[in-house]
Amino acid sequence: MGHSIYLADDEKSIRELLHSFLASDGYTVRSFENGDALLEAFRQEPAELVILDIMMPGTDGLAVCRELRSVSDIPIILLTAKDSELDYVMGISQGSDDYLTKPFRPTILLMKVRALLRRVEMDRGKTAAAVDELRYGDLRYSATENAVFCGSTIVALTQTELRLLSYMLKQPEKAYSREELLNAVWGFDSEVEARVTDETLRRIRKKVLQAGSTVSVSTIWGFGYKLKEAERT
């Protein structure tokens, strides 16, 4: 049985097309006409990936994404009929991993689904040869626990945020360009735009600060980012 995918879209024709396309590639798909039905099903049996239309009656896709992200780090792809900067930023800020504007080719969605699930498998299948622990300041990344800690407190990161922060912790004082981070975390074949790096790092910066860390994500204007530890007084 293939990976389980939940799909919510109030447009029946789109829902049936995507359901058929994903199922033909070997995925186990359940489709829903609204976000509330998907949430109810997820509470009973979580899926491995979720695809959400933003504009739906009842609980919209952004609210569903926010609810799912509060309890799970599974990959989430948002669909929207509007090519809007605000929709894009809102979607990423709610914790989605990727974004597609309608109309789109089903093959593009399939490519994104494969890439996200492949990265989940890679995260789970880290070898013993990999670096088990990385430290910078009061932050510690544990490959065994697949988590970042500030002291003894776990920093509540999604899998995408975890991949990005752990990548930067390998060389914490290096200046990383947006393009390098984008390629390292989302891959060279990704159609995700560079601004998703900015939004993901904004969330990481906020979560690290909330955990009480002395480490911050510093912006290098016109280039990218680096980690910086506050000077001790």
Mark where each language-model region is:
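The short loop immediately C-terminal to the conserved phospho-acceptor aspartate in CheY-like receiver
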Residues: 54-55, 82
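Basic, amphipathic DNA-recognition helix from helix-turn-helix-like DNA-binding domains
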Residues: 66, 70, 75-135
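Short, Lys/Arg-enriched segments at the junction into DNA-binding effector domains
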Residues: 4, 115-175, 179, 228
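Acidic, metal-coordinating helix/loop segments flanking the phosphotransfer/catalytic sites
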Residues: 31-49
